[in-house]
Amino acid sequence: MAKQRPSSKRWLREHHNDPYVQQARREGYRSRAAYKLMELQEVVKEDGKSLLLIPVGANVVELGAAPGGWTQVAVKLAGVEGSVVGIDLLAMDPVPGAEILVGDFLDDAMLAQLQGLLHEGRVDVVLSDMAPNMCGVKSADQLRGEALAEAAFQFVEENLKTGGNFAVKLFNGPGFHDMVKQARAMFTVVKVVKPDSSRSRSPEHYLVGMGFKG
């Protein structure tokens, strides 16, 4: 049997002891990432009040939905009056209250299937917590992460309603500031944050855009 590398052992130990992992297990969430979306929900403030990323009744599309932690939270936030569609290349277990589609979200056939579920054309909220399969080479991992974020931006430009909201994972890299600049041109309010529930050594940040200009 192959021995685990020290880095793998350290990750497993930290994962097991992670308070967010333990809380997710207690509360029935599929991943600790659920708490990141909870933090992003009210991260934008205006005149001392929180602007909700996912308003009650919103039609939400989540890109890269597996394993479903964000999907579970989105269903709760949108409520029975809203709708949630999760899309991923990987099959995942059903999430009560959500529709799950398997495929490439930029594929024409997938977009046609999505439109059939929405009935209203464009959507109110787009979410993306997508991350690449890490190869361990920093520059390559950064480029892969940027490619996923760019695909999410493309989906937003083609499918988000005017006035809609967007949350996307970004990684520190050569294209980070250009993406933030792009978002500021697309949205009325833009905020970049690192949630408390994000691991401190992770290079990930989240961009929240409110009020899509269309």
Swiss-Prot record:
One of its GO terms (cellular component) is cytoplasm. The active site is at 169 (proton acceptor). S-adenosyl-L-methionine binds at residues 68, 70, 88, 104, 129. Keywords: Cytoplasm, Methyltransferase, rRNA processing, S-adenosyl-L-methionine, Transferase. It is found in: Cytoplasm. It comes from the Bacteria. One of its GO terms (molecular function) is rRNA (uridine-2'-O-)-methyltransferase activity. It catalyses: uridine(2552) in 23S rRNA + S-adenosyl-L-methionine = 2'-O-methyluridine(2552) in 23S rRNA + S-adenosyl-L-homocysteine + H(+). Gene3D superfamilies: Vaccinia Virus protein VP39. Its EC number is 2.1.1.166. Coiled coil: none annotated. Belongs to the class I-like SAM-binding methyltransferase superfamily. RNA methyltransferase RlmE family. Specifically methylates the uridine in position 2552 of 23S rRNA at the 2'-O position of the ribose in the fully assembled 50S ribosomal subunit. This is Ribosomal RNA large subunit methyltransferase E. It comes from Magnetococcus marinus (strain ATCC BAA-1437 / JCM 17883 / MC-1).
